[in-house]
Amino acid sequence: MITETLTASSARPGEAAALIAEMGARARTAAKRLAQTPTAEKAAALKAAAGAIRARSAAILAANAEDMAAGQTNGLSGAMLDRLRLDEGRLAAIADAIEAVAALPDPVGREIDRFTRPNGLELSRVRVPLGVIGIIYESRPNVTADAAALGLMAGNAVILRGGSEAVHSNRALHAAFAAGLVEAGLPADAVQLVPTQDRAAVGAMLRAQGLIDIIIPRGGKGLVARVQDEARVPVLAHLDGINHLYIDGAANPAKAVELAVNAKMRRTGICGATETILIDRAYPAPLGIVDALIAAGCEVRGDRDVAALSPHVESASAGDWDTEYLDAIVSIAMVDGLDGALAHIDAHSSRHTDAIVTEDAATAERFLTGVDSAIVMHNASTQFADGGEFGLGAEIGIATGRLHARGPVALEGLTTYKWLVRGSGQLRP
């Protein structure tokens, strides 16, 4: 078969198209099977996949070490290397996340609503799988397992195309996952990994109408922009996380410091990390925020007012307000109250996650209703922007658009619905 012989160096456009067509056809067959697979069988397959990952942990970590060494040689940034790195704890978390997905309520077949028309027709909407999902992603090997688990539990077949940075990690994780599927009696074609790193394969996936039902890109602006520009199949985009934390004049200072440090520094390389902090001019202790971040190892870039607070603050450029650092860097600006914060967020937010720190309930409600982002928070760290923290299990990403899902995309976001109409012989007049 093409998938057994195609290599990264030989994948010319015609060969890549043939490869994706073959994989898509097999995925389509698997998707038909999965759409009818009972919940218990899907859950058993995921548990078997998690077990296989644990059993093969040494091989997976060795593969990841190979990727890490190559990444360091190739000059990957600290943030990219952090996303790429696996250790025993992270690998255990991947297996645990798969089992957590297996324990979630199955959305497939769930009735959304039901009603009867005056003519006696009984209508209902029920959730059904999307079909075949193509995932194109960079750096994060955990996406291999998360996407496979979520896609399968939602009754979908999945075609994975990971980045070259994580090629060995992705292959090792996929091999373990596929072994679990086969052990549980489900088709290995339910989760396939594109075997070539040639960019032509990405283009072929984007043009695979009739074979792939939706593409979900996970990566930087360049990848997402290419997918959105070239795709002929629907796209569910996960864009950058230019997230804001607004510290209101009525914020509790101790709480504000703790939230600012956690939201920025807990893990700087994730999409839920705060990148810009806005401080109300009425807030009494702005220097405390700046000093706490610097003490935590964060570089602070500030507007004129913030730069005047400390000699350790760098002056922010115009581009800083539109930058997703994914690093220990934060931009801080002083604003004129809630209206100033809302105006800044409206101009610079990527519509991912924005938060307010305040003890004023009315101000909090104005912020929650006034910010047009997928996730809006009050007195909570933006690092909670995560499907697992929302109780959704693993996530495929944070959708920042409006169709067809928004926020953490987990099981329900990987389904659609169909109408069921039950009659007794009604004729339309």
Swiss-Prot record:
Its EC number is 1.2.1.41. It catalyses: L-glutamate 5-semialdehyde + phosphate + NADP(+) = L-glutamyl 5-phosphate + NADPH + H(+). The keyword NADP applies. PROSITE patterns: PROA (PS01223). It is found in: Cytoplasm. Pfam families: Aldedh. GO terms for molecular function: glutamate-5-semialdehyde dehydrogenase activity; NADP binding. GO terms for cellular component: cytoplasm. Gene3D superfamilies: Aldehyde Dehydrogenase, Chain A, domain 1 (3.40.605.10), Aldehyde Dehydrogenase, Chain A, domain 2 (3.40.309.10). Keywords: Amino-acid biosynthesis, Cytoplasm, NADP, Oxidoreductase, Proline biosynthesis. It comes from the Bacteria. GO terms for biological process: L-proline biosynthetic process. Its main location: cytoplasm. Pathway: Amino-acid biosynthesis; L-proline biosynthesis; L-glutamate 5-semialdehyde from L-glutamate: step 2/2. Belongs to the gamma-glutamyl phosphate reductase family. Catalyzes the NADPH-dependent reduction of L-glutamate 5-phosphate into L-glutamate 5-semialdehyde and phosphate. The product spontaneously undergoes cyclization to form 1-pyrroline-5-carboxylate. This is Gamma-glutamyl phosphate reductase.
